[in-house]
């Protein structure tokens, strides 16, 4: 059976040693049986959007896992839509910096019976040229699908609860959702896996599992995520690809440290 290891929101930086212990514990947990694919769903770095050294270190640590790596950027890696990151919008320099260390930020990989599609959620609704390029890529990603099932990965969830919900900071906005429609509405879709929220949660819509990966780093104060379901325990996910569905297993080895962002604010994202 094919398997995909999903790593998300490690927020690594050479300016501190935060979260490295959690990443190392997951690496050890999978060292005896390498996954067929390692999918990093964004925010690999603490501030790669402005600091190349953060991206460089994050790339090194994520490449330390056994298996092929497909890395997708998060808002702290390349910036995002100005509504989410008003001082760090996606631009050519930020995209180029990511690509130097971690590749194109999207990809299609075929595994037996499955097509894995990874997308850059942070260019959606930005107006950047890369948004148009990716829209074409989305359509092309379905060519030659045959009887394969689809597993979609990206940093931000396609939506939190319903496909018609309004814009909010925790998911892709309606404009981006429109670009995703060819995949989200495809009858072969079985998994939409994301990060960003620092919560572990799974819901089903028909045959599709929508899974939020836990963060490898910190959790948010519950008061800042009112109404959002899920567990705050750090970890990673192992997706096992069956013939017509995905079995998702939480990896949370003993010793992983759960840290509230408020308690390390000065070492991560100091408030101005």
Give the ranges of each region predicted by the language model:
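His/acidic metal-ligating clusters that form di-metal
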Residues: 28-38, 115-117, 127-211, 246, ...
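Active-site environment of divalent metal-dependent phosphoester hydrolases
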Residues: 13-16, 46-50, 75-83, 124-127, ...
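Generic enzyme active-site microenvironment
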Residues: 7, 41, 72, 153, ...
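A cross-domain feature marking catalytic cores of carbohydrate-active enzymes
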Residues: 42-44, 73-75, 121, 154-156, ...
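A short C-terminal boundary segment appended to hydrolase-like catalytic domains
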Residues: 191, 235-272
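Extended active-site neighborhood of metal-dependent phosphoesterases/phosphodiesterases
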Residues: 50-145, 149, 174-185, 206, ...
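A short, polar/proline- and glycine-enriched secondary-structure boundary/capping micro-motif
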Residues: 17, 128-130, 222, 256-265
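N-terminal active-site segment of His-dependent metallophosphoesterases
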Residues: 1-57, 61
